[in-house]
Amino acid sequence: MTKNKLKKVSIVMGSQSDYKTMIFCQNILKKLNIKFETKIISAHRTPKRMYEFAINAEKNGIAVIIAGAGGSAHLPGMISALTSLPVLGVPIESKKLKGLDSLLSIAQMPKGIPVGTLAIGEDGAINAALLAASIIGLSDLTVKKKLNQFRLSQTKSVKKKPK
């Protein structure tokens, strides 16, 4: 597959309701001109879809997977168990425990099955996209340059004094 056809990042989530958080990943990746795809894949309700996605991700041109999940949040860990690609887990804020259940589920992986765990909710989704950009930037100087420009712009936007 040629470099231009690589999707590079796959954003997956357990349900449609998770999209309101995971859209923040898309927004950052768009700003950085990183190709991505977005899918709904439930570890519990669509296990065959999850399995096929995970075992074929690398063959399909994916470099990094960002997986958002709420509640028991098994999606990132199950995907990580099936691929050696980097998997970044975004805990989705839930009504019952405010996402703490998701955070603990994603963070407490057994040794040998790593998931890079981010913060709960919007901040985690944004940072997952930035971390994916950092990973891709290791081998893609264009992405690295865009990421450095993004961070410089972020720094410049901070006022030196309060108004």
Would you name each region that the model predicts?
Residues 4-45:
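Glycine-rich phosphate/diphosphate-binding loop of Rossmann-like nucleotide-binding domains
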Residues 7, 13-20, 24, 99-163:
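C-terminal binding/interaction regions
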Residues 8-13, 37-39, 65-67, 88, ...:
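Short glycine-rich or small-residue beta-strand-to-loop segments that form or flank ligand, phosphate
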Residues 16, 41-43, 70-71, 92-95, ...:
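Short, ordered loop/turn segments at secondary-structure junctions
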Residues 18-22, 47-50, 69-78, 97-100, ...:
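Short glycine/serine/threonine-rich phosphate/pyrophosphate-binding segments
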Residues 38-60:
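N-terminal beta-loop-helix "entrance" segment that forms/cooperates
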Residues 55-98:
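Helix-adjacent hinge/juxtasegments
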